[in-house]
Amino acid sequence: MKHLGCLVVFVFLSLISVWGKGVKEEVSVRSLLKEMVNREHLTRFPYPDYRCWQVSSTDPLSVSPDSANWFANSDRNNFLGIDSVNGRKEYILMDERPPGAIVRFWATVARYSQKGILRIYIDDKSVPAVEGELLKVLSGDILLKSGPLNQSLSPETEYLKRGHNLYLPIPYAKSCKITYESDSLKGIGNNSGEILYYNIN
């Protein structure tokens, strides 16, 4: 009888656990920020589970350790394509369809005109949710005042030679497309004009 009682309690607790996990929690900027600073949460396997993906300006020839081009190092100006939007040429940095969140965006530039416009389109909308000069979006004051979630490093380095970081989570329910517009870019993979290096998680 004792074993039966233990079995009933175990089944009951298991059902509560399953039912609890069936409840969908809304993923928002607020929930993601809370997750980032909750030390207890960091020690547990995430629920709902997720995968970390990265898009970057990595040299597309570097695909496999077995390849002769594994050490190809033209890790700049490698975009997914080009969109023409209202007469603008927007280079595509990221175009993801499943639900997710941008949790880290790093970029650095060379021969930068300081006029490049970054746009983040969320959930198939034609109007960007975020739009502004690249470095002001990442480490300036467009999304956040100066703080730990948006920094350019190192302060000892000339501003345009720094790495610019944004850790403010930006969730999306359907899709996210990130584009970059700059008249100083000379095309995909072309390094004769402005140069952009980036990583987005």
Predicted regions: what is each one?
Residues 1-8:
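Bacterial N-terminal signal peptides that target proteins for export
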Residues 8-9, 55:
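A ubiquitous, low-specificity "background" feature that marks scattered single residues
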Residues 10-19:
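Hydrophobic h-region of N-terminal signal peptides that target proteins for export
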Residues 21-201:
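Beta-strand-centric surfaces of beta-sandwich/beta-rich domains
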